[in-house]
């Protein structure tokens, strides 16, 4: 059970991420946004996905967890669950409770596309998955560009080398 202080911190982080989305990302011309959450910041990003219309801008949602529970997209939004499944990567350490004890297995697509990593130490997980993350982001952006081109949309700007996105937590 979470303490009042932990709940207050979680809610404050969620509010900051929503504020950044509403006042920076949503009003920017950017069309290829990548959300990257690490540790406890993952909850705030999944909260954002469930509470704002992010699908037109966000090409990838990447979570790098420790042993904390995997945040879930809302159960009652089938179209969002499908989108999240297609656009997410959730990297978990080797001994994450999902794999060690089968926790959350019944949550299905609401978990995103989870990947059990060989790395056992959460603090070493991010450097271990950087190459896979970069390949996933590149594939997602290329797919979005191909879809836009097929639909007759004007080409978008060329991406800079994978630079940090505006909305990271």
Where are these regions (language model features)?
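Alpha/beta-hydrolase active-site loop
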Residues: 2-28
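Gly/Ala-rich beta-loop-alpha elbow adjacent to hydrolase catalytic centers
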Residues: 36-42
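Hydrolases whose catalytic domains are alpha/beta-hydrolase-1, hotdog thioesterase
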Residues: 43-48
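The feature captures the conserved acid-bearing segment of alpha/beta-hydrolase catalytic domains
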Residues: 50-155
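Intrinsic disorder/low-complexity signal
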Residues: 149-169
